[in-house]
Structure formats: structure tokens, C-alpha cells
A protein has these predicted regions:
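Detector for outer-membrane/organellar transmembrane beta-barrel domains
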Residues: 110-181, 234
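Cleavable N-terminal export/targeting peptides
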Residues: 1-24
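Transmembrane beta-strand segments that form the barrel wall of outer-membrane beta-barrel proteins
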Residues: 28-35, 58-68, 90-98, 107, ...
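Outer-membrane beta-barrel "beta-signal"
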Residues: 196, 202, 223-235
């Protein structure tokens, strides 16, 4: 009996150790000179923290953004549940903003009433081919309506091509909105995001470095362009 108990305890402890080894936790924060998202200007200097846990391709990520230079910038808190297998990934994101036109003027997080919420729910699917990654996103619930009050199902598609040049990691991105959308300020199909980003690790010590990145982003639809500088802090 004693041997059986010891064997059972050993199996439990080994299983727990294995689960701990397979569970991945991410804690990091980006500081950016301006918050540019899919070709849209969403604020000035911002701190953008991330907390994520992952297990065998399944991950839950909390992401936020808060203005540093301008305290009236919109605060954002997003939750994403995603699954990746091979090059395929699918996910659902709950976006929340403390300010939202047509939403809750009091900025309450736990208010989900139709036509009075500051949440937007988005589904995505994508595939990473290695030489390029394709992603498609569509809003399916929350504060996303046409001017006549019907659901808009605002969508966005983008292709990202990574490459390396002069010991620097680069990505080239082209994104488009396929139809009219109040959220993306489009009246039909429109290219809304053309971006080029460079990232290089700045070594601080032998065991610690800070990724520094710069990005040129343009929105052909709104005829605006942006230059963003930022860095990432991650233990």
C-alpha cells in the first residue's frame, strides 16, 4: 500500500512539474511615442502592458494602453483568447475603451447593453506561411454599427512580410478594410495601413537587452502618415 501511495504521489508531482514546464507566462510593456493601430491615430505617448499565459497553443492575453503625455487619451483594455496549431491561428478579442462614441458615457467596463457598451468583440483567423503571414479580422458584437443603426461587421485584413537587413529585424505590412465602416472611417474598400517597422535589440548587460523599434506607417485612405519610436521592457 505504501508503495502504491508513493507511486501515486510521484505521478502527481511529475505531472505538476510537466504542466508547469509547459505553461508559459509573458509579462512585458511597450512604451511608444504615439499609438498607431491599423493606420489609425489613437493617441500620443503611451504605455502598453501585456500579461499572457499559454499552454500547448492555447493562450489568454490581457493588453492595455494608457496615455502618458495626454491623460485624456482613451484608455484601452483588451482580452484575447487564441489558439495556434502549426501556422494556423484563430482567436476572439474583447476590446474595451473608457471613451467610445455612442457607448457608455460613464465608461463602465461591465456594461454590455446593446447600443450602449464600450466593448467591441472581434474574431480573427490567420495563417503564417513563414515568408508571410495573412490575418483576417471581423467584429461580430459590441459597439460596431452603421449610421442607420444596423450591425456593421467591420472587417480588416492584412499581410505581414518579415525580413532581415543589416542585422535588423524588419516587417512590411499592408492592411485593408473591405467595406464601408464607421470604425475605420471608410466608405468602401480602402487600403488603410501601409507600414515598415525595424526592430533591434540594444544590449544593456550580457544577460539583458531592450528591443528598440521604429515604424513608418501611412493610411492612404485618410492620407495621413506617422513615425513611431518605441521600446519593450520584458524580464
Amino acid at each position: 500500500m505504501k508503495k502504491i501511495v508513493l507511486l501515486a504521489m510521484g505521478m502527481v508531482l511529475s505531472g505538476t512539474a510537466l504542466a508547469q514546464d509547459e505553461l508559459e507566462t509573458t509579462v512585458k510593456a511597450d512604451a511608444v511615442s504615439s499609438y498607431i493601430w491599423r493606420g489609425q491615430d489613437l493617441g500620443n505617448v503611451a504605455l502598453q502592458p501585456t500579461l499572457a499565459v499559454g499552454y500547448r497553443g492555447l493562450s489568454l492575453t490581457a493588453w492595455g494602453s494608457v496615455g502618458l503625455a495626454n491623460t485624456t487619451d482613451t484608455k484601452e483594455f483588451d482580452l484575447t483568447l487564441s489558439y495556434t496549431i502549426g501556422g494556423l491561428n484563430i482567436g476572439i478579442t474583447d476590446y474595451w475603451f473608457n471613451q467610445f462614441a455612442g457607448g457608455d458615457p460613464e465608461g463602465r467596463y461591465f456594461k454590455y447593453d446593446a447600443h450602449a457598451t464600450n466593448h467591441v468583440f472581434e474574431a480573427n483567423i490567420g495563417y503564417d506561411f513563414g515568408f508571410a503571414a495573412l490575418q483576417c479580422y471581423t467584429n461580430f458584437a459590441g459597439n460596431d454599427y452603421k449610421k442607420d443603426g444596423t450591425r456593421a461587421y467591420s472587417s480588416y485584413m492584412e499581410i505581414v512580410v518579415p525580413f532581415k537587413l543589416s542585422a535588423v529585424d524588419w516587417t512590411a505590412t499592408v492592411g485593408a478594410v473591405p467595406s464601408s465602416s464607421v470604425q475605420y472611417a471608410t466608405n468602401g474598400f480602402a487600403v488603410t495601413n501601409v507600414a515598415l517597422k525595424a526592430t533591434k535589440d540594444i544590449r544593456i548587460t550580457d544577460t539583458f537587452s531592450i528591443p528598440l523599434f521604429a515604424q513608418i506607417a501611412a493610411n492612404p485612405c485618410s492620407q495621413k502618415a506617422y513615425l513611431v519610436l518605441g521600446f519593450t521592457l520584458q524580464p
